[in-house]
Amino acid sequence: YKYVMEAPSMYFAPVYPNINREDHTIFGNKSGGPIGSGGFSIYRNPYASMVQGSSKQSAYTINTAFELEQKLDFLTKGLNFKALVSFKNWSKTTVNRSFSPYFYELQNPQEQEDGSYLYDYNSISKGRTALETSTSTTGDRLMNLQATLNYQRMFGDKHDVGAMLVYLQREYNLNNPDNNYYNTLPERNQGLAGRVTYAYDGRYLAEFNFGYNGSENFEKGSRYGFFPSLAVGYLISNEKFFEPLTKVISNLKIRASYGLVGNADIGSNRFPYLTKVDLGGAGFVFGDQWQTSSNGATITTYGAEKVTWEIGKKYNVGFDLGLFNKLSLNVDFFREDRKDIFLRRNTIPAESGITGDLRPYGNLGKVRNQGVDMSLDYNHAVSKDFMISAKGTFTYAKNQYMEIDEPDYEYAYMSQVGRPLNQYKGYIALGLFKDQEEIDNSPKQILTGVVQPGDIK
């Protein structure tokens, strides 16, 4: 539809009558347009663009999953094992068929006595009637393996113990990789996760988690990271001394947690520890042969040694409050200190020649994010057939750079340290210049040319 606005509708008709009995459709057009075609500058004909071809896509997805579950009570009560293998294969084929329109420009139209027109047209862009066909195929394969050992058991009336151990493995492949060597290699991830929980008499709660995860994007010795966490809670409303208050305060729980989380998502920058070399480099000059250039290998990106996981330290303190079994308030105060953030280096001198994409990556940044999360729920059953429910949420968060790889700026205000992420920077307007005297007595204005009264100061 955007082509409709490219040329006035009176410039040409979508098609003209085939008065010369051509073996193709006579699409209208006009010379002098913004598009080059066959030695002419023409306009787009929206109707021709609409009918000149078609595209057909066929997509197929195969999902397969095998699951095995076995209770192991014969070893110890409450123990069970589960294994899951899943496979997905997706493919899409696109077939495009089109022809190149013949465009003609109207010549010498003459109105006749009966109101009709006598005219001719001139070819300004030759096309082809034969259909041109192109086909493309894309797709991917994903395989997941998960094995889980789970344990849950109650000892006596008060001790509730649980444990879980999970092994994860993932492999992702492209069915039709391009000429990029990295895209021909499978993407693989592997990890082991565990959890231990304990609850005493429904009042005192504790949970320990860990993750031992591996990513192929890092070199040997840096591929695996260990990320533990610990959480505790106290359900005060289950205490005996709290029973007189339960008609009003139906639930009261306080909780706290601390843990480490890892991030290996570095976008499309696979294997950043490898230096990338292009064997088809050109334009090299040696010695005094400055008029002669040679071909050879060139480095496109320098590898980064010892690049590893981003690590975030998370702190959380909160409480849950329930009133009259109808109103629920959840409040969480949180803070995350993230370090070893994956960034390109910005402090390499330009004189070294290592600029732009040549710059290596590194674990360079530190960021702090903190704030509060709140949610309020109201549920009231008016009758067995009618219920009133409402929910509201509130979040306040503030982040800032604690450390970042940046030049040693002359002025402190130019640094990003202590400032929010992605903060906009700009000049602060001090008002408008009133007269020429004020302009003459002000610092030089570098954003405009000649400054006049009324301009922004």
Task: Set out the residue ranges of the language-model regions.
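Glycine-rich N-terminal loop/short-helix segment of MobA-like nucleotidyltransferase
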Residues: N295, N330, E438-L447
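Alpha-helix N-cap recognition
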Residues: D435-E438, P453
